[in-house]
Amino acid sequence: MITIRGLAKSFGKLEVLKDITLDVRAGKVVAILGPSGSGKSTLLLCINGLEELTKGSIEVNGIIVFDSQSKKERVKHVRDIRKNTGMVFQQFNLYPHKTALENVIEALLTVKKMEKSTAVGLGEELLKRVGLFDKRDVYPSRLSGGQQQRVAISRALAMDPAVMLFDEPTSSLDPELVDEVLNVIQELAKEGMTLVIVTHEMQFARNVADRIIFMADGVVVEEGQPKDFFAAPKTERARKFLKMEEKSERNEEKL
């Protein structure tokens, strides 16, 4: 489904990703963990073509982008990759002047050129799927953060992607709203959708992911099954990270 080989990404002299090589199989859930500044979000942006790779190659659902490709071919392949991927960001990025339903169907009308009645029917089904059918005519300003993020998930699903990418989808939410978004993602996992999730929700990653990828300083430090990673991380860097996360969780529980 996703094949990455020797991926590097630099912003000027700053090398953010360094020789990343990994695979994501169809129907699997991969959680990417790591401290802030480790390159996790940049990796997702490169997969989705929102950031141009500096070196290496990325293949998504049989479509490949690589460093020595002609500009014309790369632009075409990036466009095709975006059609195969849905992305949900930390910020919801909903159109404030459009209702929940209008946000969901916007791309169906403008990109897929779908008939409005068909798009509305699909949009309503997607809002039902995330428990927001009754909010279809509500504007984002009247929705909670968790509800807005669920609308954003519906919007990404509307394009029928082969893989969903989540960039810390709960980081902007109040603690009491986190579970409603995680529950939607968990349902997608149960349905067998391919998911790549950057997250700081350790318990969620432990319960839902098929594989953990731990990044630090722009490289993949460690990867493995959740039960192995959380019980006995192989590297000192991963052990230190998990201890810090456990300490943070304990402090939050005291508040």
PLM-predicted stretches and their roles:
Residues 164-167:
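Catalytic Walker B motif of ABC-type/P-loop ATPase nucleotide-binding domains
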Residues 48:
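Helix-to-loop junction immediately C-terminal to a conserved catalytic motif
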Residues 223-224:
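ABC ATPase "signature
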Residues 56-67:
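Conserved ABC transporter NBD signature motif
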Residues 65-86, 117, 232-233:
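ABC ATPase NBD coupling module
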Residues 138-141, 159, 191:
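Conserved signature/switch motifs of ABC ATPase nucleotide-binding domains
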